[in-house]
Amino acid sequence: MNRMSTIFLKIALVLIGIPILALCIFLVPKVANYSAELFPNIAYIKYLVFIYLYVTAIPFYFALYQAFKLLSYIDKNKAFSGLSVRALKNIKYCAVTISIFYAAGMPVFYLMAEIDDAPGIIVIGLVIIFASMVIAVFAAVLQKLLKEAIDIKSENDLTV
């Protein structure tokens, strides 16, 4: 792969991470305060929302880091290695983790949507769940294909 294309993809990864970081810094506190206003009788809801949203950001950034490592392996001509397979496996697990976290949090989204009469909150949660699952399936397919390609390559290297 051309080095410029991997540099472009690395820049794209950074540009994907920056808005999520901005959301974590600026929007998460507002959402937590808003949830505390919606549920004044549940004192700990603000901190629960804080923890929930920040914990879901951890696998996202870990997956971005793994994608960055994968692009580095491609730059070093180590694309067909066990390291690449492991990076794809980690990306798959991160995507599944994000889906599980948001699926577990959907009841809170539902309650917020019911109180505020905003069904868009539920749609946002569902979009995040399904997008993460699509990424997980795509990473799993790529992982399997890469593993098979590595096996074929090693067989060809042994037959020479």
Curated annotation (Swiss-Prot):
Residue pairs linked by disulfide bridges in the UniProt entry: none
Entry GO CC: plasma membrane
UniProt entry keywords in alphabetical sequence: Cell membrane, Membrane, Transmembrane, Transmembrane helix
Localization per record: Cell membrane
Transmembrane segments: 7-27, 48-68, 95-115, 121-141
Membrane topology, as annotated: Multi-pass membrane protein
Coiled coil regions, renumbered to chain: none
InterPro entries (alphabetical): DUF2975
Membrane found in the keyword field: yes
Record protein name field: Uncharacterized membrane protein YoaS
Organism: Bacillus subtilis (strain 168)
Gene that this polypeptide is encoded by: yoaS
